[in-house]
């Protein structure tokens, strides 16, 4: 999503609509988070769209910033869209809850992962709580609600090994199967 978000006609590739966007802060950096849809709302990186249900069209709900500016929530983490709220780390590591309709920040915490460029948290719903796998190799079980973040448990699973600037990261998403978690870094 380095230059734009586009809606295409699948059979012929015709562009229905396009919204210019800048997701990368530097050459070689782009947002890689997966788009998230709930009902008629589509969240791509830091852009929340209201999709038109009658025709292939959309309008931006938030943020209220000019086209072509850096509009991003997280470079690497896919947000969780739950009810009328969005839960996600920001690119610098702060973890936030946003009102899905307005983008207004309801709360933030700096306790999930380190505050640094390249911060990443993978979110996996698990009943009434969530598993959060951090770029530091920690698995966290937490409750996320519009009123706040509550950490229930934390365990360190593996060392981060992927270098970026002076820091090391564990960016790979975890996999869950048969009550097991599978995680990896560059060495194991």
Q: For each predicted feature, which ranges?
A:
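Noncatalytic, solvent-exposed loop/strand surfaces
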Residues: 1-188
């Amino acid at each position: 999503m380095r230059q734009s978000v586009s809606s295409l006609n699948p059979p012929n590739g015709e562009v229905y609509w396009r919204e210019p966007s800048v997701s990368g802060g530097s050459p070689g950096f782009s947002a890689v988070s997966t788009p998230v849809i709930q009902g008629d709302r589509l969240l791509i990186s830091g852009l929340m769209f209201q999709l038109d249900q009658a025709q292939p069209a959309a309008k931006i709900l938030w943020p209220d910033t000019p086209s072509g500016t850096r509009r991003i929530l997280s470079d690497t983490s896919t947000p969780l869209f739950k009810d009328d709220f969005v839960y996600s780390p920001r690119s610098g590591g702060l973890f936030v809850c946003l009102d899905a309709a307005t983008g207004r920040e309801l709360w933030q915490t700096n306790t999930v992962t380190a505050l640094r460029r390249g911060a990443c948290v993978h979110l996996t719903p698990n009943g009434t709580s969530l598993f959060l796998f951090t770029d530091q190799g920690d698995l966290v079980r937490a409750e996320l609600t519009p009123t706040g973040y509550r950490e229930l448990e934390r365990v360190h699973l593996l060392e981060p090994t992927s270098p970026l600037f002076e820091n090391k990261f564990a960016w790979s998403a975890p996999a869950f199967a048969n009550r097991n978690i599978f995680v990896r870094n560059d060495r194991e």
